[in-house]
Design a protein with these regions (language model features):
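Active-site helix of classical SDR
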Residues: 148, 152-155
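Adenosine-cofactor binding site in Rossmann-like domains, unifying the SAM/SAH pocket
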Residues: 37-62
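NAD(P)H cofactor-binding loop motif with strongest signal on the N-terminal glycine-rich segment
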Residues: 24
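NAD(P)H-binding glycine-rich loop region in Rossmannoid oxidoreductase-like domains
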Residues: 57-97, 109, 126
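Conserved Rossmann-fold NAD(P)-dependent oxidoreductase catalytic core, especially the SDR/UDP-sugar
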Residues: 101-146, 172
Length: 333
């Protein structure tokens, strides 16, 4: 790789460069828009689902031919928890494949300089060695509860690689660890563990309960990254010099980069931390009759380390920030 990989290029993200962020209302997409605006980018393209149905090829074609963005961030996806993935696998694989295919294909056909595709750590095998390296992709069976979604995301990675090979494009995939932050989903039936814990402890505190029940033994280890750090990493990559960015696309096998903290925490430690930040004074009860899930999920972030980027927001500060946002959102209800 070239020596200047750690030097962001301001001209790559000049104020007037036209950047299309697909999925700007989601947790990650909204954070990327905030980060780009903070960097001084003032020519951002966003569209709601009502304005642009990304599953409709004709609409996507018309949009790209009319607007002709220079950079595309593909953060749009159909997402959901274990229940939704198990009940509607056909929708998850179809809608994600269509969104990715339409955007990647028409990006190439309209001469897009750079595209950043956001995947998910669920692309890695269920029993992957820890920490999970990018090279472990397709080295074993997937987690069956969300394999339709994972296969769609893997197809997106392979589509970017194929277009790079055939059309000499510069389409790069990034795989985030578990994300959290302002704008997260706090629905207890659909949310992930961290926002669910925030809500549980808050509601227990407000109602004067003496205990909060947490599923499992508390021993599984998980990695968490604040969504603003994820956005900063994406913008950092998009701002790399043209030669450095192209070097990544050409040399990385597979052509993807993990983005995470590089360290994990047990669910028990996480629960204790959330309890402290929320101010709940009762006990934590671990329901050991409930499943634990995978013992550990930690990303290897060596590739991002080599590029000179590291996450800045500590888990404690990030949870406090997220809880503050949650309190404001609750007050609006």
């Amino acid at each position: 790789m070239t020596e200047d990989l750690t030097t962001p290029l301001s001209s790559a993200l000049s104020p007037d460069v036209k950047i299309y962020v697909a999925g700007h209302r989601g947790l990650v997409g909204s954070a990327i828009v905030r980060q780009l605006e903070a960097e001084g980018c003032r020519n951002l393209l966003v569209r709601t689902h009502k304005e642009l149905d990304l599953i409709d090829q004709s609409q996507v074609r018309s949009f790209f031919e009319r607007e002709r963005p220079e950079i595309v961030v593909l953060a749009a996806a159909k997402v959901g928890g274990i229940l939704a993935n198990s009940m509607y696998p056909a929708e998850f694989i179809y809608e994600n494949l269509m969104i990715q295919s339409n955007i990647i294909n028409w990006s190439q056909k309209t001469g897009i300089k750079r595209l950043l595709f956001l995947g998910s750590s669920c692309i890695y095998p269920k029993l992957s060695p820890q920490p999970m390296k990018e090279e472990y992709l397709l080295s074993g069976p997937l987690e069956p509860t969300n394999d339709a979604y994972a296969v769609a995301k893997i197809a997106g990675i392979k589509m970017c690689e194929s277009y790079n090979k055939q059309y000499n494009t510069s389409y790069l995939s990034v795989m985030p660890t578990n994300l959290y932050g302002p704008g997260d989903n706090f629905d207890l039936e659909k949310s992930h563990v961290l926002p669910a814990l925030i809500r549980k402890f808050h509601e227990a505190k407000e109602s004067g309960d003496h205990e909060v029940v947490v599923w499992g033994t508390g021993s599984p280890r998980r990695e968490f990254l604040h969504v603003d750090d994820m956005a900063a990493a994406c913008v950092y990559l998009l701002g790399l010099p043209a030669a450095s960015y192209k070097d990544l696309v050409v040399k990385l096998k597979p052509c993807l980069i993990n983005i995470g903290m590089g360290r994990d925490i047990t669910i028990k430690e996480l629960a204790e931390l959330v309890k402290e930040i929320v101010g709940f004074k009762g006990q934590i009860i671990f329901d050991t009759d409930k499943p634990d899930g995978t013992p550990q999920k930690l990303l290897d972030i060596s590739r991002m380390d080599t590029l000179g980027w590291k996450a800045k927001i500590s888990l404690r500060a990030g949870i406090a920030d997220t809880y503050g946002w949650y309190l404001k959102s609750v007050q609006k209800l």
